[in-house]
Every structure is written in C-alpha cells, then in structure tokens.
Amino acid sequence: MTLTQQDASTVEKLDETLHEDRILILDFGSQVTQLIARRVRESGVYCEIWPFTATEEKIRAFNPRGIILSGSPASVHDENAPPIPNVVFALNRPVLGICYGQQAMCQMLGGKVESHEHREFGRAYIDIAEDCSLFRGVWARGKREQVWMSHGDRVTQLPPGFRAVAHSEGAPFAIIADEGRRLYGVQFHPEVVHTPHGAALIRNFTHNVAGCSGTWTMAGFRELEIARIRKQVGSGRVICGLSGGVDSSVAAKLIHDAIGDQLTCIFVDPGIMRTGEADEVVKTFRGRFNIRLVHRDASELFLKELAGVTDPETKRKTIGRLFIEVFEEEAAKLGGAQFLAQGTLYPDVIESVSFSGGPSVTIKSHHNVGGLPDRMNMELVEPLRELFKDEVRMLGRELGIPESIVGRHPFPGPGLAIRIPGDVTKEKLDLLRKVDAIYLEEIRRAGLYDAIWQAFAVLLPVRTVGVMGDGRTYDQACALRAVTSTDGMTAEVYPFDFAFLNRVAGRIVNEVRGINRVTYDITSKPPGTIEWE
C-alpha cells in the first residue's frame, strides 16, 4: 500500500472536520485539570491542555473557540503566582476561569482577591441570584445548588463589566459573568463529580457560549486515525507489543484495520497474568481478528529473575527490563520493521506543571516501553496519543473488540507480581489466581463489575491459625480490594454488603487449599494507593 495524494487529502479533510471546534485549557497546576478536558471531550468537543507558559504565537495558531483557565495550588498573592497570558483576553474568545482561574482573571482585569479566614473545602451550596448564559437550562434563579469548593482566597471586588450571578456562604462571587465579553468565572470545581451538574455547565460553555457543534466522536477519530496511519506507514512494516490490556489491544486493532498484514504483534507472556488472560489474547487477536501474532511464553524466565526479589520497585524494574529484552529478541527475529506501535495516551504527553522547581516525587514506577524506540532505531506509531482512557474504551467498542477486553478493570503492567507482597513463586501465583477468579466471578454474578473501577485479591505474606473440620490449619491470608473512581487519581472503597463478602470469603476458604483467612481492605486513596505495591 503506497501513499497517494488522495490519502493525504483525506487526512487533511478528516482532521479539519474532527478538530474544527476546539477548546484550549490552560493548566496552572491543578491536580484535576485532566478532568476538565474529559468533561469537554464528553460534550463532543476536542480540547488540549497546555501549560500557562504557552506562547502567544502558539495560542493564536491553535485558534480555540474558547479558553478554560484551570485551578492551581498557588495563590494569586504568591511571589511566583502563575500569570494568565495576555493573549487570552486579546483574542476576544469566551473564557471560563475555574477557582484560581477565576481569581487570576479578576485580579488581572482590575478586581481584588483576598485571603479569608472562612475557607471552603468540600461540599458547599450556592444560591443562584441571576440568570446567566453559562448555566442557562441547568440552574435557575432562586435555586440552591450543590457544588465542590476548594479555596482559601476569594474575589472581594469585581472587575469593571462583571456582575455576580451566584454566591455561597464563603464566596460572595461564586459565579461571575461579563456577558458582553463572554468572560465567566466560577469559584467551585464543575469538573469533579461532586458538583452534580458540573458537566452540564461545561457543556453549556462549549456549546452555547463558545458555539462549538460537537464534532468530536470516536467514529470520526477511527476514520481519521486509519488515514493517518496509512499516510505515516505507507508500505512499511509495523511491530506492536501486545499485552492484552485495553491500550495495546485497541492500538493493535486500529493499526490492523489500517494496514492489515503489514502489522505483526508480539505478545510476551510473563506468567504473571490472571486466569485465562494469555489464552484470551491469542484467541482474540490471532483467531478472531486474524492479526499476525508472535506468542512468546517467557514465564520461566520471569519467575527465575524474580526469585528472592521482595522490594516492590525492584520487582517493577525487573519486570520492565525483561519485557524489553524479550520483546527485542522477538523483534530481531522478525527483522525489517521500520515502525514501532505504542499505546501512548493523552495523559502521557501532557506537559506537567510544577511550581516547586523540582521533580515530583515518584510514588511508583510506571511500567512502559519508553526506552524501546531509541534502542531499536524505529519510528513510533502512536494512534491513541490524543485520547483519554475512557475514550480508548469507546474506540475499542467502535472497533468491535470484545467487552471482556475493553471493559476490563485496570491491570498493572507488573501483573500479579505486585499483588504478592514479598517474593514471587509459581505456587503463590497459582494460589492468588484461584482466589482472584472466585472474587471476580462473584462480582460479575452480582452484577457489580461495571459499578467498580478496580477489584482484585492480594496474597498476604502472613500465615494465620484456623480450624477446618476437626483439625488445626496454619495457612495464608488474603485481602480483597474493590474501589470506585473516575480516573484512578482518588478512589473510595466499594461498599459491599456483608452477605456478599461473607459468601465470597466462604467460597475462598472452602475452595482454595492453602487459604484460611479473608480480609477486606477499606482504605481510600489517599491515604492509601489502589494497589498494595
């Protein structure tokens, strides 16, 4: 397959249609900036997140229909408080300032912001005093609405042209508007789920205020990305590391739809996957989709290298190194490929913002193959780099990938190895697989799987005394974990009823020889992390 002028023209036309309406989100360091982008995308509008340091030239070239200013951990009174670029208001486009974004906008345009002893953190209620385009059809004058606040500073004097349209106990200017210039500010966070109608408010901004029509769809993205892949690859060959996870599965199917047998997938089975997952990968991609697939069973190698390793970080790094080494071996056998496919997502490419001047603390190393392209002298194909995880799942459904794959709970790259605190052995893996399979089977049977962000079992490195029949046992304990979340950044424990937990625990201790005690982890994130290691 060779590139033609028609291919290039197709890419240009599809790209223009899909990205015609776009919103720019300027990031001032908020931990939830990505949630703003997800709400915008959910409204059918393409958007990008850029740091507040973006140049005027770049912002003008992007030509957004509207601009959203994020929150920030900073105060507008800090010596190095992040400023709003002057071009934001020079463009005469609609602007929505959120929390710090509202405060910085007010201060820049002639208002006043002060620290106040009455701070608002968590659930709060605002009273709607006047009608406003920002929430027309969502909230009505005279109503009280629930929102989520997180601020110490507050606006105390509005800039010329603005009016207050809502207030709360701790924020006299909870929502402000300059309808003439289409400038709006909210002291709360509409992007979080704790503001019940926040997504509708953001949709109002993108559609009713900024005039976007909602051209961003996964059907359109699929068509565009297939054309892009054909344009980039031409008649070249692509190899793709297939893990069985959502990202690599969707990337592989999308690329195969574009170039067919020019793609070869390499599936390295490390022996640390859940029950039946390795077989499902082979069955789905080789059998159902007819994708060229190299299947390497490397379980013995991984177990040998992990023997005696107890430190979680060392486990992760060992597994990551082995994946790369085995992948390189198999790729070398194939020979002749010019392109390497990766399931890079948009959160991976967003430029992070730090006000401390130093790197952020590494809580856990992320398992990826970021070192491969330079070492292998190959050009990257990253068909998912514009997408968030939830969009990848939607695209997977558009591509016809089974729900058992696209709807699967997040699973860490190091697999079950980090769900076994201490050293990893085949016996421990077999034990954990049995426990995990029973737990997930019961969750599905109860119709709860899709209501839970992530559920799994952990094999604890402790033995406990028990009684089975007339005899004493001294076997291992396991922990069950289930959380709800929207993005994995924060998580709440799932509130199973006791009857469910009792049923699961009963099955585990009766059906899994070697387990005599079951616990349920009720720790939220923070302070805990979702995974144990």
UniProtKB/Swiss-Prot annotation:
Q: Which residues form the active site?
A: 99 (nucleophile), 189, 191
Question: Which GO cellular component terms are attached?
Answer: cytosol
Q: What class of enzyme is it?
A: ligase
Q: Which domain of life is it from?
A: Bacteria
Extract one GO molecular function annotation from the record: ATP binding
Pathway the protein takes part in: Purine metabolism; GMP biosynthesis; GMP from XMP (L-Gln route): step 1/1
Provide the catalytic activity annotation: XMP + L-glutamine + ATP + H2O = GMP + L-glutamate + AMP + diphosphate + 2 H(+)
Please give the InterPro entries that the UniProt record associates with this protein: Class_I_gatase-like, GATASE, GMP_synth_C, GMP_synth_GATase, GMP_synthase, GMPS_ATP_PPase_dom, NAD/GMP_synthase, Rossmann-like_a/b/a_fold
What this chain does, per the entry, is described as: Catalyzes the synthesis of GMP from XMP.
**Name of the protein in question:** GMP synthase [glutamine-hydrolyzing]
User: Organism classification, top ranks?
Assistant: Bacteria, Pseudomonadati, Pseudomonadota, Alphaproteobacteria, Acetobacterales
